Amino acid sequence: MTDTDTTLHVAQTLGRPLRVDVIIAEGFVLVELSGVVEVLRMANRINPASLFDWTYRSVKGGYVSCGAGLGTLTEKLSEKPDADYVFIIGNSNSDHPDLSLGATISAYSYRKAKVLLLSEAASRFISEHPAGSGDHTTHWENRAVLQERGDPGGEGTYALAVDDGRIVTCAGMGATVDLMLGLVGNHMSAAAVMTTADILLHEKIRDFKTLQPFGGKRLTMTGDKELDQCIGMMQSHMEDPLPISELVERVGISSRSLERRFHRRLNTTPNTYYRELRLNWANNLLLNTTLTIREIGMACGFLNGFSSLYQSFFGVTPTVIRQNKKGAGLVR
C-alpha cells in the first residue's frame, strides 16, 4: 500500500477530514501559503463534506507575518504530530533558522505523514541532508545559490516538484498550485479537480516533471522559434556570454533579423536583453551568497566594470546592497 493509499484509507475509515499542518516562519512567502490553503479551501467548497482541515504552525507559535505585511496566528509545533500532510512554506530569508526542521520532518515522517517542502524549505533540507534527500528540486534561484556556495546539495533537477516517496520537494511560488491540484486529486474525482482548477482560472495542471522556466532551463516561449533559440543560448551562457555574432551564426539568421525580432517581440535589443539577464542573475547571487562582488561579476560574465553596470541598472551600488542585506535571503 502506498503512502497515498494509506492516507485515503485513514480518511475513509475515521470519517474525518484529512489533517494538514502548514508550518510558517516570520517572512514566509505569501503566494505559497495562499497557494496551499486556497486550493484546500476550494476543494472543500465543491465537495459535499469537507475533505481537509488545516492548522497553521510555527516553531514558537503566536502571530507570524510575511513581507507583504499580512500574517496569521499559529500554534506551536507538536512533538507528536497527528497530521496526514505537512507543508513547510518558503521564506524571504533563505537562511532563517526556523527553516532548519530536520527533527520535525522526521517526527512527521515517523507517523506516516506526507512531508512537502516548498522553495527555501526544500533547499534548506537539501543543504542539511544531502545524503538523505534523494532526488530533489527547489526554486531555480535557490539552486543557483546552493551551487555558487559549493553546497553538496547543489546538484538536482529543475523540475517543478519531485516526490521521493517520503518527502516532496517543490519549487514553490506559482508551482504551488500545480502541486496542490495534484495532491487533492488523490482524494477527489477528476471532474472535481478540474472544477477546482477552473474556479482558480488555472487552465493547465502542470506535471511534476515540467521544467521551471529560465533558471529551470525551459525556454521562454515568445512564439518565434529562432528568437527562443537565441534566448535559450543566452540563458545557458551567463558566465561566458556569447557574442551576438556567434548567436546569429548558430541560429542561422542575420544580426539585423535578430534585432528586429527582439524589438518586435520584447521591445529591446539583443545586447540589452542579454545584459539584463546577467545583471538579474548577479543580483540574485549578491543577495543570497557570500561571494565577493568581484566573484559575482566574474560568475555572470562581467570581467570588468560590474559595479558601475549594476549601479546604472539598479540605481545603487552592489556594495550598498550587500551592506543593507547583511546576509538576508531571497526577496519574495
Q: What is each PLM-predicted segment?
A:
Residues 3-78:
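N-terminal beta1-alpha1 cap of cysteine-dependent amidohydrolase-like domains
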Residues 55-115:
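Flexible gly/pro-rich beta->alpha loop and the following alpha-helix that scaffold active-site loops
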Residues 104-141:
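Catalytic nucleophile loop
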Residues 157-201:
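Conserved anion/nucleotide-ligand pocket segment
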Residues 208-272, 289-303:
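DNA-binding recognition helix and immediately preceding turn/loop
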Residues 230-234, 262, 266, 270, ...:
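Short hydrophobic clusters on alpha-helical segments that form packing/core surfaces
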Residues 269-274, 292-294, 315-324:
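Short, Lys/Arg-enriched C-terminal cap helix and immediately downstream tail that follows
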Residues 288, 299, 304-332:
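…primarily DNA-binding HTH/wHTH and HhH modules…
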